[in-house]
């Protein structure tokens, strides 16, 4: 009899344990507009908000101690000095993310959008890649593959909205001449060779005198590119490659370093103003790039560890306007679209279940990446 009673107590304990697990993980936390927010999507938004807060943490704040960090204060605007308690910041950013996702879904559907099989496959494939890479972290935070798939599909919808709103057949199309003007004035296509300002074997960094010598030699190479006067992008890239092959051995020798087989390989990239601001951090580097005309070469130290030997080229000599349209629209109108989506999401009817959200508190976030 005692054994049966014990078995019954154990069974009841298991049932109550399972009930508690079910209660602590609701299927949804409500909706914003017609967008139903699953618990997984809520947790993903909350985890992302926590990571945003972690990026703003001070060097003396430990973001792996989630409960403690949530009680601390971070500076949210370095210019104004505005601060926020982390828990409040995370709650605010979580809601803003969910509002934006709801607005993306609503706007996409309102414009008659429907993802193609290829778009769905691309989103799902990327979601699987994310799970393969970050699966342990996602799982620890209650985020599964289906949630990541749903999120990535919304990202595809968001990208598609740029064309649906601003494309040739969009609601408010941006004319080709506007795109071309933005491309000329605010984007920079460069063909470049990256030169490390350190010995590639010992990783000993160049001192100021060595950097000056390397820059002088690289600029002489750039001058030879300009003297060649190449009229086409192909001519300009060929001249750049030849100049690099001739100059790099002497440049590397400043640090007793040697070139490799691909040291003179030319790379091409179309940069936005945001890219320039984040990558060209050395004093005067960004302005040096902006001042270049199409076909003009220069040597520019872009940060403490990298020197570029580069030539600015006409993007429309490399790609057609149609090929560049989405990239230009993203740079030109991406911020405007995001602002509109954020405002639209905030205006949608909010039917959120506070009791459900309270069962998914930020204090349960697992964050093993210490703030650097």
Task: Describe each model-derived feature in a short phrase.
Residues 21-27, 242, 246, 294:
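A short, compositionally biased
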Residues 1-9:
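Positively charged n-region of N-terminal signal peptides that target proteins for export
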Residues 16-20:
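C-terminal motif of bacterial Sec signal peptides marking the signal peptidase cleavage site
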